[in-house]
């Protein structure tokens, strides 16, 4: 028989397991990688596959097994692993996964890998970040720079060893190594990791190279100085902690949050912080992003440190991708640099998520969770190149939509270059030849040039997809829903009327959408300036209400009044939250993406519904400005909750009314505002009370990181 097996079957010890099972059953034959698949030719039958499924490695996943008759040549006397073919393309490898308990114990022990940071086996370690192309063999990864020593070669060839056919097997004799240098590039004596740990303990700012990129490292008691040095005034930092006991010292995670934190994927998880966590780590928030070590280096670092927690934030120039180059990183001006000589092929930031019950809301889907895909069942090759903020691209092949790692915000040339590199790499891995390329409707987005060039290269059609329709399509694609009424709520997206949308009630399928209602339009005084100077939003609302304005001087008021007449309009839920945040004294200036909305969450969580915030729909607009007239009469938390509840209630009522008339039983929630747990709770409450099923994100990012999935789904539907 010939068995072609599809799934996560490369780089996880799958072929060695096939070998061991076949040998134990006395079978003859061969097993090989073939692009994205594994092909087994053997004299075994279905019982062999049943046994194989029962003994799968921890990281492996069999998705399908195709069987065909095959006469094994008499010349094959035994069972063996043979060289890879390359007739099939696709992503069948696992993500980078945290060092496993066996390798951790070995690294902390007294054997030949004692203290060796690159200790891994078939069950753990870097994969995607080291990989150039399929199939996953050592010569197609950056580990080809490090030929195996005899001892590692012996492990690689031993069927009983957990490093049997482990493509990145190495040791201190033959593998990558760390070095420690000062701010001028001069070597620092001593064990690199131990010395780096002592310098961090002493209050220095360091940069450490890991899998997929580099981190800026600091102790928690140096956060104010770190903010001044790095130029990050308010944006929260992620905190890496030594172990689960330390998580519980600083935070109150739910069981689901702790399960994600301790998973092999090791994302940053937003958890409720305790008073023991310094407030300046995540100012004005009731949560903090926390994660556990996932590399050997990080475990060794905490073994040597006196502190049990450290700031670990991506090392990059603001607005640019995370730095990979050892020379370029010196420009950041840290006190010391812990660097290694293993080439990073694919950059990957840490994944970031928050949990709403069992639903995973990915704020950033990257290291540990990519490559990944969703099955959509629509044939054809297509690419979606995403929006401008929180950029990703997606590539469709064989009924699946595969997404790139998190790219970043696309205003800079460096981010657009990174988008091109990551997308081209994924296209190559999948063997995709797109017939259609989808991009955002906004005419000014910097990635459009790449999209057009990509389409020209393949002779593909180019389509433009409205931003909030793409949000809806991303939710439909991951949930397997053909059509739905949905709330698509975020900061901004170019509308078909030329205005900035963002508070939308829609009916959508993959061929069209209807805009059922939207939040009241308000002027964006000064355009993009209003996104940061959020008093402009409050000023615009007070103009609509005819309210006295006492928070700007007369000259500024005159400038704002004149500018409002020619300003673009916005229906954004994000801008509505910004205006609330300013009105309630929560936030005066937006210094990072989503800041006012994030700082509203603690208020929303504590608030109760009070009378006086009821609203109505007038000519398709859900009225909001009137809520600000008497907002100061109420407790801040009650005003915040009641205003948001009133708007969500009216949006859900509008969606439910349409859904009832058209036999639809599901109502979705998508867009960046849906990351707010209180807003998700309010949405679910009203949807279920009205007798509908809420549809929420779990695998595709709620925010703009999921836009490319929706674009690609819409593009695929066009090909059918």
Feature locations, PLM:
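Intrinsically disordered, low-complexity, mixed-charge
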Residues: 1-168, 172, 176-179, 190
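A contiguous, well-structured pocket-lining segment that forms one wall/lid of small-molecule binding clefts
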Residues: 153, 164, 168, 175-177, ...
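Internal gly/pro-rich beta-alpha loop/helix module
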Residues: 155, 305-376, 569-570
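Conserved phosphate/anionic-ligand binding catalytic regions in large, soluble enzymes, centered on
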Residues: 205-219, 310-321, 490-500, 566-587, ...
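A phosphate-binding glycine/aspartate-rich beta-alpha loop in the early core of alpha/beta enzymes
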Residues: 212-273
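Conserved phosphate-binding catalytic cores of ATP/NTP-utilizing and phosphoryl-transfer enzymes
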Residues: 248-254, 300, 322-329, 350, ...
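Conserved phosphate-binding/catalytic loops in two-lobed NTP-binding clefts
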Residues: 440, 458-470, 665-670, 677, ...
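Glycine-rich phosphate-binding/hydrolytic loop that grips phosphoryl groups
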Residues: 468-489, 493-495, 534-543, 644-645, ...
């Amino acid at each position: 028989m010939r068995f072609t097996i599809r799934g996560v079957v490369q780089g996880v010890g799958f072929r060695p397991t096939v070998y061991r099972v076949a040998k134990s059953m006395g079978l003859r034959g061969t097993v090989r990688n073939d692009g994205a698949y594994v092909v087994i030719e053997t004299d075994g039958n279905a019982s062999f596959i049943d046994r194989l499924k029962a003994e799968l490695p921890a990281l492996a996943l069999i998705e399908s097994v195709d069987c065909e008759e095959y006469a094994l040549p008499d010349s094959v006397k035994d069972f063996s692993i043979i060289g890879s073919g390359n007739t099939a393309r696709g992503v069948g490898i696992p993500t980078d996964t945290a060092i496993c308990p066996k390798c951790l114990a070995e690294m902390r022990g007294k054997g030949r890998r004692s203290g060796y940071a690159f200790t891994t086996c078939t069950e753990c370690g870097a994969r995607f970040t080291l990989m150039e192309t399929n199939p996953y063999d050592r010569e197609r990864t950056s580990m080809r720079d490090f030929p195996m020593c005899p001892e590692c070669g012996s492990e690689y060839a031993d069927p009983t060893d957990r490093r049997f056919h482990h493509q990145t097997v190495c040791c201190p004799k033959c593998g990558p190594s760390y070095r420690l240098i000062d701010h001028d590039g001069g070597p620092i004596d001593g064990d690199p990791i131990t010395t780096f740990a002592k310098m961090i303990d002493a209050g220095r700012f360091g940069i450490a190279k890991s899998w997929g990129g580099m981190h800026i490292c600091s102790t928690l008691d140096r956060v104010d100085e770190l903010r001044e040095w790095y130029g990050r005034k308010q944006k929260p930092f992620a905190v890496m902690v030594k172990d689960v006991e330390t998580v519980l010292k600083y935070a109150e995670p739910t069981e689901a949050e702790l399960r994600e934190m301790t998973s092999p994927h090791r994302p940053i998880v937003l958890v409720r912080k305790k008073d023991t966590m310094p407030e300046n780590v995540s100012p004005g928030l009731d949560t903090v992003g926390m994660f556990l070590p996932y590399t050997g280096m990080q475990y060794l670092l905490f073994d040597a440190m006196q502190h049990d927690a450290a700031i670990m934030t991506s090392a990059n120039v603001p607005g640019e991708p995370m730095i990979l180059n050892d020379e370029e990183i010196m420009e950041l001006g840290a006190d010391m640099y812990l660097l290694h000589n293993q080439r990073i092929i694919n950059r990957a930031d840490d994944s970031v998520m928050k949990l709403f019950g069992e639903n995973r809301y990915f704020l950033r889907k990257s290291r540990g969770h990519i490559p990944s895909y969703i099955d959509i069942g629509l044939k054809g090759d297509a690419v979606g190149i995403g929006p401008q903020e929180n950029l990703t691209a997606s590539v469709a092949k064989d009924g699946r939509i595969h997404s790139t790692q998190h790219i970043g915000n696309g205003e800079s040339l460096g981010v657009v270059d990174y988008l091109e590199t990551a997308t081209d790499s994924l296209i190559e891995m999948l063997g995709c030849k797109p017939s259609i390329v989808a991009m955002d409707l906004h005419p000014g987005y910097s990635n459009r040039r790449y999209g057009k060039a990509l389409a020209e290269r393949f002779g593909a059609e180019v389509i433009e997809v409205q931003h909030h329709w793409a949000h809806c399509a991303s939710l439909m694609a991951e949930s397997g829903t053909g059509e739905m009424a949905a709330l698509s709520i975020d900061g901004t997206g170019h509308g078909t009327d030329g205005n900035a949308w963002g508070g939308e009630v829609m009916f959508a399928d993959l061929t069209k959408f209807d805009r059922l209602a939207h939040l009241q339009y308000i002027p964006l005084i000064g355009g993009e300036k209003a996104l940061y100077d959020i008093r402009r939003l409050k000023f615009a609302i007070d103009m609509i209400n005819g309210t006295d304005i006492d928070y700007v001087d007369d000259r500024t008021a005159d400038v704002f009044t004149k500018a409002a007449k020619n300003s673009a309009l916005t229906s954004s839920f994000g801008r509505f939250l910004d205006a609330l945040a300013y009105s309630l004294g929560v936030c005066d200036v937006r210094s990072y993406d989503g800041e006012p909305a994030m700082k509203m969450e603690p208020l929303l969580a504590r608030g109760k519904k009070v009378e006086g915030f009821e609203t109505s729909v007038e000519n398709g607009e859900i009225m909001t400005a009137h809520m600000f007239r008497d907002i100061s009469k109420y407790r801040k938390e009650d005003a915040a909750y009641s205003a948001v509840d009133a708007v969500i209630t009216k949006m859900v009522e509008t969606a439910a009314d349409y859904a009832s008339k058209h036999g639809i039983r599901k109502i979705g929630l998508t867009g960046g505002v849906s990351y707010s747990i209180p807003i998700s709770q309010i949405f679910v409450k009203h949807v279920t009370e009205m007798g509908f099923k809420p549809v929420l994100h779990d695998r595709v990012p709620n925010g703009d990181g999921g836009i490319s999935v929706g674009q690609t789904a819409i593009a695929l539907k066009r090909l059918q």
